[in-house]
Amino acid sequence: MSHVVVKNDPELDQQLANLDLNSEKQSGGASTASKGRYIPPHLRNREASKGFHDKDSSGWSCSKDKDAYSSFGSRDSRGKPGYFSERGSGSRGRFDDRGRSDYDGIGNRERPGFGRFERSGHSRWCDKSVEDDWSKPLPPSERLEQELFSGGNTGINFEKYDDIPVEATGSNCPPHIENFSDIDMGEIIMGNIELTRYTRPTPVQKHAIPIIKGKRDLMACAQTGSGKTAAFLLPILSQIYTDGPGEALKAVKENGRYGRRKQYPISLVLAPTRELAVQIYEEARKFSYRSRVRPCVVYGGADIGQQIRDLERGCHLLVATPGRLVDMMERGKIGLDFCKYLVLDEADRMLDMGFEPQIRRIVEQDTMPPKGVRHTMMFSATFPKEIQMLARDFLDEYIFLAVGRVGSTSENITQKVVWVEDLDKRSFLLDILGATGSDSLTLVFVETKKGADSLEDFLYHEGYACTSIHGDRSQRDREEALHQFRSGKSPILVATAVAARGLDISNVRHVINFDLPSDIEEYVHRIGRTGRVGNLGLATSFFNEKNMNITKDLLDLLVEAKQEVPSWLENMAYEHHYKGGSRGRSKSNRFSGGFGARDYRQSSGSSSSGFGASRGSSSRSGGGGYGNSRGFGGGGYGGFYNSDGYGGNYNSQGVDWWGN
């Protein structure tokens, strides 16, 4: 670098001293339109059209620069540190793209519109076309298409699904559809359905889509893994594309500009856990591809500042856990004034986790439109009395939809119950894993966090590639574990109940209840991680004296699903019922045709099938007593797993799905 001292030319000093800023003569031949402006010497003889002062009415030098600053997180990152330059670039980083771009994107919220405006670099809020016709698709993005739809949709057992009974109750129930093309959902939705390779709607989708498109409130109870998420996302997004943003977009613009504004989502989806919220969000991304709708997700356990920055880019469909949403509302970042669609997913789980005060605060004590004005949907695998009472408060003239038996398990899941003492569980687990193919995903449930860490460490030292998740793990660690499991790098996942609900992990072949849960509903949700969306699966449960409280309900569930019942379980249930009294029985009786099994509006009272009836309703073979019949039989476990052991469970006819 040169350090030569430059002395001012006396003639130049004299010129500057005599400079008159208000003189037209100083313009150096510039256009008279610049009267009164000081023109730097190096620009004085240029054409007016090339002058730096050629600004638009807003004062920005060009549309590119204007757009670059009109949206936080745009692709133009001039003047920012290197870390911030990745925000909004559409990369698949986990939370903040700092050295973690290998992750598959769960929890990633750093995409401004998911590539919709990435070529032009401007925000949807500055594009006047967004106010015109939201039903028209935006230009495609090959990169984004590959990112969203490369997962595929394989192994669907639709033939089996067609036999599942459906019951819909309520006034003027719309007719169901047989194909997606039977109802007009618009060009964007139909194109995205094709990209996801959905060929036919599942039973819950056949009935729920026309109900929601008809703007009716819905309480739907369907088997776990039956396609509930798409059942509400497809019609809701279709309706948003048809109706446009309405007053919500206007409210955002009036509230503030350039990122400092409250967002007014048109649709709100509440979910009990972070994992389920992220899964719904990822599905929403797929079905909002090439649209002007921007989904967002907020949940606890993650950086709230990062989530706020994501919200500030725009939010039309919000997926949230109740606690974090209340926090966002109290911070003034979210307003529900224009929320047209409310979805409560896994509603029973939210009540079990104690979220009812937050849910009522969100729905009843804030600015959300009342029932009858908004459209409300509740989805879950079980609907006990408490949930149906909540539906009475939140839903208006709703339709009750039961797909399969309420609170039931899928017949696509072969259930095996084996007697294993606590000291023998680890060795028995090794026998099972040894008989399982190395490429099969196996989910092992335990009751405690320490138990999860201990079992993971044991399996690791036995040479198995495994990982674990539980409530004490950080959000990043949990997402990394799920990524390793989904990708098959660690085909064994040890989990506590935090992963039991809502996790949509395709191709899970085997669920093992290393520790059985204390209530039968948790059992239903755990084994529902396999056999999803018509695929075949296997569930194995280790049973001993500690699990006596669910004996009766477990027996009823196995009988109902036409599963093999060990004779020792029958004997224990009989003894427990007649000798042990009711003190040890589980709190649930909904697998016997009680309140939760049907629409309470049509039930005159809670009825229950007697123990003797359920016990005598099926014939089962097997040796008596506890001694020689606690395993899978003479062939051993490996023989069952490697044989075509699923077939026998699908030949039954006339299943009494409704508990009559």
Swiss-Prot record:
This is ATP-dependent RNA helicase DDX3Y. Widely expressed at the mRNA level, with highest levels in testis. Testis-specific (at protein level). Expressed predominantly in spermatogonia, but occasionally detected in some pre-leptotene/leptotene spermatocytes. The modification Omega-N-methylarginine is found at R100, R109, R590, R615, R630. Residues 603-620 have a biased composition (Low complexity). CDD domains: DEADc_DDX3, SF2_C_DEAD. GO terms for biological process: cell differentiation; gamete generation; negative regulation of gene expression. Residues 209-401 form the Helicase ATP-binding domain. Residues 579-588 have a biased composition (Basic residues). ATP binds at residues 198-205, 222-229. Residues 15-34 have a biased composition (Polar residues). A motif (DEAD box) lies at residues 345-348. Keywords: Acetylation, ATP-binding, Cytoplasm, DNA-binding, Helicase, Hydrolase, Isopeptide bond, Methylation, Nucleotide-binding, Nucleus, Phosphoprotein, RNA-binding, Ubl conjugation. Residues 412-573 form the Helicase C-terminal domain. GO terms for molecular function: ATP binding; ATP hydrolysis activity; DNA binding; mRNA binding; RNA helicase activity. InterPro entries: DEAD/DEAH_box_helicase_dom, Helicase_ATP-bd, Helicase_C-like, P-loop_NTPase, RNA-helicase_DEAD-box_CS, RNA_helicase_DEAD_Q_motif. The modification N-acetylserine is found at S2. Residues 1-10, 44-68, 93-121 have a biased composition (Basic and acidic residues).
